Curated annotation (Swiss-Prot):
Pfam family, one: Ribosomal_S21
Gene Ontology, cellular component aspect: ribonucleoprotein complex; ribosome
Protein name: Small ribosomal subunit protein bS21
InterPro entries reported in the protein's UniProt record: Ribosomal_bS21 (IPR001911), Ribosomal_bS21_sf (IPR038380)
Keyword Disulfide bond: no
Family per similarity comment: Belongs to the bacterial ribosomal protein bS21 family.
Domain of life: Bacteria
Any one GO molecular-function label of the UniProt entry: structural constituent of ribosome
Alphabetical UniProt keywords: Ribonucleoprotein, Ribosomal protein
GO biological process, one term: translation
């Protein structure tokens, strides 16, 4: 991933980079891969994520 620095404003470039990384899901992936995840825990996490996505879609449809 690449971020351009304008006017030597490194703080703003870091903020943009962090935003891009979080939107791409890299931070979440790093957190998951930090330690071994048992298959049962993995299934449970995936089910919770799917439920959240479904609820989000339902909220958008009802609005």
């Amino acid at each position: 991933m690449e971020v351009k620095v304008f006017d030597n404003d490194v703080e703003k470039a870091l903020k943009i980079l962090k935003n891009k990384l979080s939107k791409s899901g890299l931070f979440k992936e790093l957190k998951v891969r930090r330690a071994y995840e048992k298959p049962s825990v993995k299934r449970k996490r995936k089910a919770i994520e799917a439920r959240r996505r479904f609820a989000k879609v339902q909220r958008r449809r009802s609005s």
